[in-house]
Amino acid sequence: METSKEFEFRPAKETSRSKSPGGIVGRLSNFARNKARHSLSEKGSNSVGGSGGAGFDKPRKDLLKEFHKCKEAQDQRLDLSSIEITSIPSPIKELTQLTELFLYKNKLTCLPTEIGQLVNLKKLGLSENALTSLPDSLASLESLETLDLRHNKLTEVPSVIYKIGSLETLWLRYNRIVAVDEQIGNLSKLKMLDVRENKIRELPSAIGKLTSLVVCLVSYNHLTRVPEEIGDCHSLTQLDLQHNDLSELPYSIGKLVNLVRIGIRYNKIRCIPSELESCQQLEEFIVESNHLQLLPPNLLTMLPKIHTVNLSRNELTAFPAGGPQQFVSTVTINMEHNQISKIPIGIFSKATRLTKLNLKENELVSLPLDMGSWTSITELNLSTNQLKVLPEDIEKLVNLEILVLSNNQLKKLPNQIGNLNKLRELDLEENELETVPTEIGFLQHLTKLWVQSNKILTLPRSIGNLCSLQDLRLGENNLTAIPEEIGHLDSLKSLYLNDNSSLHNLPFELALCQSLEIMSIENSPLSQIPPEITAGGPSLVIQYLKMQGPYRGVVMNSQ
């Protein structure tokens, strides 16, 4: 079970092609987000146009009428998005009062030269078209601050862009750009640069001239290096380099003293420069899916604001050197899929804010003696290790809500597990358990209990006390019977009894589980139920239990 928080830079956060990036990007410019709120039918003193939601499919002459209306009303905003425009009539040059022009989601392959006469334009939205170039006349737009060219067919950054010195926000995501020219250094006012999802192999050294740059998003490209000059971008707070081919970071990264977030996951990085410890404002350290074998000593200790640490899918064999102090402010730790064999005693003794710990897919053979001190943890994932014993001190994790221990070598559970009063999910699949302790019945908030693929022979009668249980998975065990108390599970929705070769009957009380929606009985003989009934599947089996059992009247009256 995943316990790590998704890094906000990840594209999974942007499900709509027209959705603007979040965080500071959204604060820098929200015009793309709002474009769908306006329609041609809206009347206002400062806007005209539409987002296409009303089925607007006007011929050229009607488009000219919109220009005329806009000019007559001296509207400063014109939205002609989603109306399948293939070209812009030249009379647009007369709309010199415009400060915002939106042409999103059309079929434009080029822009007219006349657009350069809109000298008051501050925002120009052109995303989701088929543009391959821009007219040189755009250099005349000396007031332009925001240019959105996402989702076009650009193979290079149009040279005219480098001449628009007033630009503060430049979106070029989802194009086919292979390079960024040294002339990018001319854009001295640029605060946000988004070139994600292109084919860029290298950033120019002139990137260092962008001293006003606050957000730089370069993920999903083919970068093999980052220039040392990036360290001169001293205003940077967000640097996204995820999903590239980087093998190292420049030492100058330490000069980015205002950096709050750096995205370097899914690269080929083998070491982190110790200079990163100078980035005292960093709040997240996410280096998932690289080739790290260790971190610089005390690196995390020197970053006091770190609340999220994700070192998953690397080649670590031990915890980072830095002792308990390195996790003082940490809320989430994800170190899954490494080669860690030991959790140092006391490593979390100062982690009073730690709520989520994921050590899935490592080589742990035991848990530390002070495990009981992890009292703040709410989610603990220790699946796919080599654990043979769960310490009795597990009961001290009083805030635990999710416990994942699947795919280990556990032979028994401590009775103290029943003291985890807040536990909602317990995953014990693929272990070597032969019994489930009676104390399991004390877990009144448990909604999910997975114990499939063990060696369980019987269940305790206390299973019927799990009043919140919704998902019970008992498949692939050695069960010989199901306790009649299962009928008390009023919230049960899913029940898996498959692949229990010694299970020959089901209790009539199962018919009392009125919330049951899914039941699996494949490869369980159920020989004491007529074969023509079992052949009909779980639904018919439940009907049989209703009709044949002593609770027939109760069940029928509740229908």
From Swiss-Prot:
Residues 1-17 have a biased composition (Basic and acidic residues). LRR repeats lie at residues 74-95, 97-118, 120-142, 143-164, 166-187, 189-210, 212-233, 235-256, 258-279, 281-302, 305-326, 329-350, 353-374, 376-397, 399-420, 422-443, 445-466, 468-489, 491-513, 515-536. Residues 1-55 are annotated as: Disordered. GO terms for biological process: fibroblast growth factor receptor signaling pathway; intracellular signal transduction; muscle organ development; positive regulation of Ras protein signal transduction; regulation of cell projection organization; vulval development. Pfam families: LRR_1, LRR_14, LRR_8. GO terms for molecular function: small GTPase binding; volume-sensitive anion channel activity. Keywords: Leucine-rich repeat, Repeat. Belongs to the SHOC2 family. Acts as a Ras effector and participates in MAPK pathway activation. Probably acts as a scaffolding protein in a protein phosphatase complex that specifically dephosphorylates Raf kinase and stimulates Raf activity at specialized signaling complexes upon Ras activation. Required for vulval development. Involved in fluid homeostasis. Plays a role in nicotinic acetylcholine receptor (nAChR)-mediated sensitivity to nicotine. Interacts with let-60. This is Leucine-rich repeat protein soc-2. It comes from Caenorhabditis elegans. The lineage of its organism: Eukaryota, Metazoa, Ecdysozoa, Nematoda, Chromadorea.
